[in-house]
Amino acid sequence: MAILNGTEVKLYTVSNSGVGAGNLVAFAQNCSISIEHSPRDITNKESGGYSESLEGLRSWSIEMDGAYAYTDAAGTALTNGADALIEDNVLNLRQKFFVGFGGTTTVTSDVRYWGECYITSWSVSAGTEDTSTMSISLTGTGVLTQNVV
């Protein structure tokens, strides 16, 4: 089993099929995906004093932070930066969009996760004489799909 280099795990917007390279979210430094399962309680009088559970709701979310930039070195507005995500999916339309998370190398057997999500929070920090950073939180809606490419 090969250990995955964290640099190869990236966040990108994708088509509604989850295939293709997607549009990489620029300047990401850290990203994580979380999948949760909340079993439902079925404890009853015959449970013998122990709680019992069955399958329940699942949810997923993605957190990302990185350097904040809204233009490239030539001064052209980024189309794959955090500002573009915020403008397109929060400020103008409050819409959900498809996102992919996973390996982006050309090596076969890369695992990618993709699904539809909403931006639930976004913040920018800008300290004096320091790199401006941004953080973004995405909450999935519906199924999170795993692809091996």
Residues of each region from the PLM?
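Hydrophobic transmembrane signal anchors and adjacent membrane-proximal interface regions, especially
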Residues: V9, G56-R58, L91-L93, G142, ...
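Residues within well-ordered beta-strands of beta-sheet-rich folds
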Residues: E63-D65, F98-G100, S137-T139
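Short, cysteine-centered beta-strand-loop-beta hairpins and adjacent loop/turn segments enriched
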Residues: A69-A74, L144-N147
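Short, acidic/charged, Gly/Pro-enriched secondary-structure junctions
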Residues: A74-E116, T120
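Short solvent-exposed strand/turn elements
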Residues: S132-Q146
